[in-house]
Amino acid sequence: MSGTLPLAMTASESFVGMQVLAQDKEVKATFIALDRKLPANLKVPYMKNAKYRTCICPSSNHLVDDCVCEDVIIAYTAHRNNAVAALLYSDGNVIHRSGTLKPKSQNRFDLRGFLTSVNPGESSKAEAGTSKSTQKAYDRKDKSPSKGKNSKKGGKKSSSERKRKEYSSNSETDLSSDSDANTRKSKRK
């Protein structure tokens, strides 16, 4: 081996980036609740590529799912960053022309999602199952008229629609004829 050390990677070559988290009331309240000192700025590392998505917490190298880090908030935000960055960079490299999508300089993470997984039943979002925006989208789809060729009044009906109507009318007549036959039998007796 030669006596020279390898050159350090530049920020653009590195697989690890740093992201600053905004300190809002929710973050401060969470740190106070966990009896931890709030750092001056919440800088959290994240992985730029899903291929390298190991956990970035102070303990030894392991996957995100196997994390045993005691600093819950920093570990959680690092993991969340891993997942977000993996989506942005891995899929973005394939689709986006520039090759890389730059992360936002500041991001606010919803720590309630993590805390409700520890203490379920605290979040109304978790209880609802779907967000309001998702529900509105479903409602819009239900209300919007179909835009097919056959949706106009007086237009031709498709063969499947005709068959469905024929089947339903046949089944109704069968039921009515059965009930008529039963009433006739009872009258004869």
UniProtKB/Swiss-Prot annotation:
Constituent of viral factories. Binds to ssRNA and dsRNA. InterPro entries: Pns11/12. Residues 158-167 have a biased composition (Basic and acidic residues). The lineage of its organism: Viruses, Riboviria, Orthornavirae, Duplornaviricota, Resentoviricetes. It comes from the Viruses. GO terms for cellular component: host cell cytoplasm. Residues 168-180 have a biased composition (Low complexity). One of its GO terms (molecular function) is RNA binding. This is RNA-binding protein. It is found in: Host cytoplasm. Residues 114-189 are annotated as: Disordered. Belongs to the phytoreovirus RNA-binding protein family.
